[in-house]
């Protein structure tokens, strides 16, 4: 099994989404010892944002890098994304990666009945971290966007592991992380029992 692990937080070692995504990958390694993990840190190794130049693919090195990103995505059976909420949405580095994998004719296509995803059969696990609590849907453009986008690509097996309110206080941060990790442990126990 191939697993693609992406982190997008700019906070480095203090990032909750990175801690959660690492815990998710560790869980997958315990459940599936044969798993092959490919890791990409989108903050330390960002993908260039789309521009007229990158879309034209006149630079062979840029075209090869874009194809490598696409192949990592296509070959992965499980994708783990560390996705913090930045300004009600996702980091621009994660959006730049999405722009490289959401490609007509590769991961979706248009039909007479509407668009159809071509990237089905994958499992997506999102490690979501938020400084506040966003129970009001009108303030959350992060999780609905990710669900919609990956659903559009044909991925319907999507799990969210969420830590909210981490900026309220050190205690809130610890409690939110503990709750998210406890949920992850419960999911692992259920998988082992199945």
Swiss-Prot record:
Keywords, alphabetical: Flavoprotein, FMN, NAD, Oxidoreductase
Cofactor note: Binds 1 FMN per subunit.
GO-annotated molecular function: electron transfer activity; FMN binding; oxidoreductase activity, acting on NAD(P)H as acceptor; oxidoreductase activity, acting on NAD(P)H, quinone or similar compound as acceptor
Keyword presence, Transferase: no
Binding residues for FMN: 9, 15-17, 85-88
Keyword Flavoprotein tagged: yes
Annotated EC: 1.6.5.-, 1.7.1.17
Domain of life according to the entry: Bacteria
Stored HAMAP family: Azoreductase_type1
Subunit-level organization: Homodimer.
Protein family: Belongs to the azoreductase type 1 family.
Role description: Quinone reductase that provides resistance to thiol-specific stress caused by electrophilic quinones. Also exhibits azoreductase activity. Catalyzes the reductive cleavage of the azo bond in aromatic azo compounds to the corresponding amines.
Name under which the protein is recorded: FMN-dependent NADH:quinone oxidoreductase
Organism annotation: Xanthomonas oryzae pv. oryzae (strain MAFF 311018)
Taxonomic placement: Bacteria, Pseudomonadati, Pseudomonadota, Gammaproteobacteria, Lysobacterales
